[in-house]
UniProtKB/Swiss-Prot annotation:
Record-annotated ASCH domain positions: 6-94
Record-given protein name: N(4)-acetylcytidine amidohydrolase
Lineage: Bacteria, Pseudomonadati, Pseudomonadota, Gammaproteobacteria, Enterobacterales
Catalysed conversion reaction: N(4)-acetylcytidine + H2O = cytidine + acetate + H(+); N(4)-acetyl-2'-deoxycytidine + H2O = 2'-deoxycytidine + acetate + H(+); N(4)-acetylcytosine + H2O = cytosine + acetate + H(+)
Record keywords: Hydrolase
Family named by the database record: Belongs to the N(4)-acetylcytidine amidohydrolase family.
Function according to Swiss-Prot or TrEMBL: Catalyzes the hydrolysis of N(4)-acetylcytidine (ac4C).
Length: 103
């Protein structure tokens, strides 16, 4: 069985499959992805594969420069996005935005 290239919390699976979530914000450990990469996607909780995505772009962002567009692409409010990022990556300020589409 092929390993997954990237994982998402299960709560995001339906939004990804429906095209409502089109970016992910990660820390430096996942900053190596580039436009054109096809990635196998699994659930964080059980590593179960659920789709393949294509990276369509990448950029950098800080917690302070997150904006409404990022929130819309994540399918959540800006306040919720900032809270989620701060919970997942405590004490970090520099992040990497990965734009993607389902294949």
């Amino acid at each position: 069985m092929q390993p997954n290239d990237i994982t998402f919390f299960q709560r995001f699976q339906n939004d990804i499959l429906a095209g409502r979530k089109t970016i992910t914000i990660r820390d430096a450990s996942e900053s190596h992805f580039k436009a054109g990469d096809a990635l196998r996607v699994g659930r964080f909780e059980d590593d179960g594969y659920f789709c393949t995505i294509e990276v369509t772009g990448t950029s950098t962002v800080t917690l302070d420069t997150l904006n409404e567009k990022h929130a819309q692409q994540e399918n959540m409010s800006l306040d919720e996005l900032k809270r989620v990022i701060a919970e997942i990556y405590p004490n970090q300020t520099q992040f990497y935005v990965i734009d993607f589409k389902c294949l």
